[in-house]
């Protein structure tokens, strides 16, 4: 019995010593491990964890194309952006960077990097993103043009500004890609007022072309329906009165042979290109000028050249047949006014007289018939 107890005691002692040795070994192994992962960015990390690295000056990486991708983010610039002010986290856009070390960066060029990242905008701005899918920019991108504008090209990335910025900044955004058009626009009656004077009443690029569903001349209905774009401002009586401009321009255009044909196209064949001029064909597209500007396409000295774009055989007197956008009056085209007035009086008088003659003649015939019947009766 004593021998059995001694054997059990020795066995238990061996187990205790073995367990202690294993525990000590585990403790030693743990002490040799690197710092816990809680010290590096994890899913749900805040912006300060990202900026701890990405606010370091000169942070960059080389791409396979040989381009340098700068990774330093200016803290104040981001915090003053619309996203920074709303407290959005970096990882809401950079979803593939939620863990550290980061996943391999797949972009080969800086442009590829932008194309990979801009689609994250759709997570919060789905309706705006969907609108871009029908734009000329998106169609160009789908056609293989990687330089076509995407969200971040216009709005920026870490410096997104709120939409209440001065309207005069809009043309400068478009200028990044459309510099030649911008140079024409800034000298036009619209552009000089907006860019040079800060006048908020004149149209910027997006007022005519749209914001996210940007349209342009490559879209046939855009040209056909462009008079309606011009009419938004030029039929606004309050706005036009402010600048002493007539609101008759649309009505006089529609009453003209050119405008009548365009309206028929709009109603009957909206997908077909019209063979008649619209506003921009005569006044210019981005280079519209004041009517008394020597560079204006519709000033008297230049009008023949404008007409000859469609009427190559037009003579010097040809433009005189056009009433411009004036309604005939004693001041403008008095001869046409008097002819028009004459027919306004003459035609109702003739038709009215004929109508009275028919009525009197018919009445007389009925009365004569009644008299004959009474006489024979």
Set out the residue ranges of the language-model regions.
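Short sequence/structural segments immediately N-terminal
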Residues: 3-11, 19-377
């Amino acid at each position: 019995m004593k021998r059995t107890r001694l054997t059990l005691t020795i066995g238990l002692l061996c187990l205790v010593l073995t367990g202690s040795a294993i525990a000590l070994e585990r403790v030693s192994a743990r002490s040799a491990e690197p710092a816990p992962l809680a010290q590096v960015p994890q899913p749900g990390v805040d912006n300060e964890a990202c900026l701890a690295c990405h606010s370091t000056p000169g942070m960059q990486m080389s791409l396979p194309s040989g381009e340098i991708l700068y990774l330093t983010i200016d803290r104040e610039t981001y915090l003053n952006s619309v996203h920074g002010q709303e407290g959005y986290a970096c990882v809401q856009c950079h979803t593939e960077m939620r863990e550290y070390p980061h996943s391999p960066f797949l972009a080969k060029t800086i442009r590829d990097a932008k194309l990979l990242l801009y689609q994250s905008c759709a997570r919060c701005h789905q309706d705006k993103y969907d609108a871009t899918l029908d734009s000329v920019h998106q169609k160009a991108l789908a056609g293989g043009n990687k330089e076509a504008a995407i969200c971040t090209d216009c709005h920026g990335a870490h410096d997104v500004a709120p939409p209440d910025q001065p309207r005069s900044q809009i043309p400068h955004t478009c200028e990044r890609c459309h510099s030649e058009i911008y140079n024409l626009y800034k000298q036009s009656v619209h552009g000089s007022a907006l860019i040079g004077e800060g006048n908020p009443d004149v149209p910027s690029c997006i007022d005519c072309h749209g914001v996210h569903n940007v349209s342009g001349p490559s879209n046939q209905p855009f040209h056909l329906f462009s008079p309606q774009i011009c009419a938004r401002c030029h039929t606004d009586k309050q706005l036009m009165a402010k600048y002493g401009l007539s609101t008759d321009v649309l009505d006089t255009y529609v009453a003209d042979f050119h405008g009548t044909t365009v309206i028929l196209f709009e109603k009957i064949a909206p997908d077909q290109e019209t063979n008649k001029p619209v506003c921009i064909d005569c006044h210019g597209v981005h280079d519209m000028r004041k009517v008394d500007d020597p560079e204006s396409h519709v000033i008297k000295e230049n009008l023949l050249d404008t007409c000859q774009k469609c009427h190559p055989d037009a003579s010097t007197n040809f433009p005189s047949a056009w009433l411009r956008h004036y309604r005939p009056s004693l001041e403008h085209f008095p001869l046409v006014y008097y002819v028009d007035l004459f027919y306004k009086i003459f035609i109702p008088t003739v038709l009215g007289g004929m109508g009275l003659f028919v009525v009197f003649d018919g009445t007389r015939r009925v009365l004569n018939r009644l008299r004959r019947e009474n006489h024979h009766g």
